[in-house]
Amino acid sequence: MKKVMVVAACLALVAGAVYARKLNKEQKRLETCGVVMQEVLNIPDNIPHELLEKSECVIVIPSVRKLAFGIGASYGRGAMVCRKGAKFNGSWGAPAMYALEGGSLGFQIGGEATDLILLVMNDRGMESILSSKVKLGADASIAGGPKGRDASADTDAWMRAEILSYSRSRGLFAGVSLEGSTLRPDDEASEQVYGRSIKAKDIVRSEKMGVPATGRHFVNVLQKSAPRNESEQASNQ
């Protein structure tokens, strides 16, 4: 019996290793988005639950870095998950890959990687992001999101913003600004995840798009934390 258990355990380890080797870099990146989202939600006084409930989409860009030492411009890739339905008021759907380029995180991140989390709060912000690449602060309004108990104090600020931004850094950190950055669909990365050519808007708009295995953790984390859209806009639709 012990031999059988040992053999079974070995086979499980081998299967896991084979699975890991087969994942391409974009599939691994999508898995990382789920891990980052879970870790961020575990931080005390971070993203207020009421804001996550009212969001239509969540974008996670892990490990954003400066392009070069002394240059503010940054680059990162990640994924966006939106609620299903024409008005984005259903359960969380399949992920689409996105890229963040340009702009400046300044000296706030130094040489360290920074994880970014963006909440898309209304239809205007969502339509802008789905249409094409968006310059944050110009094509879509963006503001640093309130944390924990600060949510009520900053109500006016986040109600006006189409996108709220949060960050987590493993090194010294003094805040983050995403104005001037460009957010765009990364359709080539989505193709690597889904195994076929597909655009971000088609992924998000589809009611029947299946969630790839590497994206299930990301979707499940959001579904468990904020299963329903509790915004006034959604409740009136």
Can you say where each PLM-predicted feature lies in the sequence?
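Sec/Tat signal peptide C-region and signal peptidase I cleavage site
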Residues: 15-21
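Small-residue-enriched, tightly packed secondary-structure blocks
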Residues: 21-237
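Sec-dependent N-terminal signal peptides
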Residues: 4-14
